[in-house]
């Protein structure tokens, strides 16, 4: 190994500038600085709770620099790690770098060991209330937002209807009777409680109970955020410029568990913005390994998986109790089910400002786009085909029909599990692609050239296990 130690040097947050600096090093030879700017008005917060969340991001974001040379020893100069926390970061690095091991032909069982430097495990609390939904630009986060808007009891302003009064019979009222009829009939305790709940719903909705947040890509995301129309929290992340320089030299490059970093960023945003729930949009298919390498399952979406989600929830539980919650609202759904719900609840509203494409964020553009050749474009077109009229769907790609593009046949064969492994990308399970293609073949007979098996009892609307709060499952998911 070129370097022996990866060093977590220190982190600093300036409440005036709202800038977090993270400092890392390799031996005494290299130093890196990464920054996060939280560009919004800060709420009152517990500085001790914030510091704990900052440490989590400090340790997680270091993976971008650690993976360049994979030093055998990790050294911590600032920040506390008890055994459970050290185990969490060790596992997340090791498993989250699965694709990295594969692409660079490294041992997929390479150990990553975070040192334990404390036996203390202190509980902090945050007083936040409300929902903080992540916006990534694609269909999944938009569906989450619309589901919360429509079904969560504290994100709607629809009042409880007044109980209708019986009509008076004509010619039977004296002047005394008429004065009595104008009085409000006393409401029952349950009706009063319902009205109180309606007022509370309206109050919370008006005060920003449901809000959104994002990391980077502000020019491209602004039209989408404006269309959503909710209070939004912007975060800007800046990598150390040496990352690109060293990647062009001798550093190793490859996929990192970016959603694990976003999970830690979201927790900080929740504390700084006075929110409780960090709501993500990771679906059931994120649990499926992309391929197997030297006997080890490799999952491109590991940090979107339920396994990571439950590990991170356990970390937050030890650190913050129930005062901060992290979960994915879409975990019970398959990708095809998500596409169906998105088509029904959100497509027409967002069709000209959303994109699930890998190349959506062109830095010289002020809007997102679709490339029409990447795995996510191909998969998105496939799963939306059964639920959106052809002309509307083709319009997203400038009139192009991706299913009929001969150049994309090899990619669709991968998605369908006909040839090779599934693409190393955020795409659905093979059986979901097959179910979507089966429906698409009813519209396009020319797609019958794709031959595959699909279990007769496969139900894409089946609800899968999830690790979300019970009230979200009951009040939102089961109401759709």
Residue ranges and their predicted role:
Residues 1-130, 141-142, 147-152, 210, ...:
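RNA-binding accessory domains that recognize and position tRNA/RNA substrates
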Residues 153-171, 176-187, 193-201, 205, ...:
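Short, basic, low-complexity termini and linkers enriched in Ser/Thr/Gly/Pro
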Residues 250-257, 296-304, 326-333, 368-371:
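Alpha-helix capping and helix-loop boundary segments enriched in small/acidic/polar residues
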Residues 1-22, 29, 296, 318, ...:
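ATP/NTP-dependent adenylation/nucleotidyl-transfer catalytic domains that generate, transfer
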Residues 212-250, 276-290, 305-321, 327-338, ...:
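A conserved beta-strand->alpha-helix junction
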């Amino acid at each position: 190994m070129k370097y022996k130690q990866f060093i977590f040097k220190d982190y600093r947050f300036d409440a005036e500038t709202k800038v977090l600096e993270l400092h890392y090093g390799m031996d005494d030879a290299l130093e890196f600085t990464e920054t996060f700017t939280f560009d919004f008005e800060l709420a009152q917060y517990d500085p001790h709770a914030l510091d704990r969340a900052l440490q989590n991001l400090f340790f997680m974001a270091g993976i971008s620099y650690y993976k360049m040379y994979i030093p055998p020893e990790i050294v911590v100069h600032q920040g506390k790690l008890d055994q459970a926390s050290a185990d969490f970061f060790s596992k997340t690095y090791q498993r989250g770098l699965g694709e990295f091991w594969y692409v660079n032909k490294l041992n997929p069982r390479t150990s990553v060991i975070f040192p334990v430097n404390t036996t203390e495990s202190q509980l902090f609390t945050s007083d936040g209330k409300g929902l903080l939904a992540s916006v990534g630009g694609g269909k999944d986060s938009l569906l989450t937002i619309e589901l919360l808007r429509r079904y969560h009891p504290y994100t709607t302003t629809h009042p409880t209807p007044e109980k209708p009064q019986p009509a008076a019979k004509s010619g039977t009222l004296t002047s005394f009777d008429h004065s009595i009829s104008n009085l409000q009939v006393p409401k029952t305790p349950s009706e009063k409680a319902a009205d109180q709940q309606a007022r509370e719903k309206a109050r919370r909705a008006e005060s920003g109970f449901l809000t959104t947040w994002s990391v980077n890509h502000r020019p491209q995301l602004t039209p989408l955020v404006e269309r959503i129309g909710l209070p939004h929290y912007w975060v800007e992340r800046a990598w150390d410029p040496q990352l690109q320089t060293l990647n062009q030299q001798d550093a190793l490059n490859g996929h990192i568990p970016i959603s694990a970093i976003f999970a830690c960023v979201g927790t900080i945003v929740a504390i700084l913005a006075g929110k409780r729930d960090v709501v993500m949009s990771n679906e059931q298919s994120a649990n499926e390994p992309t391929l197997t390498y030297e006997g080890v399952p490799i999952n491109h979406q590991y940090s979107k998986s339920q396994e990571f989600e439950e590990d991170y929830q356990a970390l937050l539980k030890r650190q913050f109790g129930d005062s901060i919650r992290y979960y994915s609202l879409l975990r019970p759904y398959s990708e095809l089910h998500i596409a169906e719900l998105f088509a029904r609840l959100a497509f027409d509203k967002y069709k000209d400002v959303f994109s699930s494409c890998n190349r959506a964020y062109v830095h010289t553009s002020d809007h997102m786009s679709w490339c029409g050749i990447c795995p996510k474009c191909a998969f998105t077109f496939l799963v939306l085909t059964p639920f959106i009229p052809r002309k509307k769907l083709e319009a997203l790609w400038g009139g192009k029909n991706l299913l009929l593009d001969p150049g994309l046949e090899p990619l669709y064969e991968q998605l369908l599990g006909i040839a090779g492994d599934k693409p190393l990308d955020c795409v659905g399970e093979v059986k979901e692609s097959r179910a979507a293609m089966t429906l698409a073949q009813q519209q396009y007979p020319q797609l019958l050239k794709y031959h595959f098996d699909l279990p007769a009892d496969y139900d894409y609307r089946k609800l899968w296990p999830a690790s979300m709060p019970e009230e979200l499952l009951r009040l939102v998911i089961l109401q759709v």
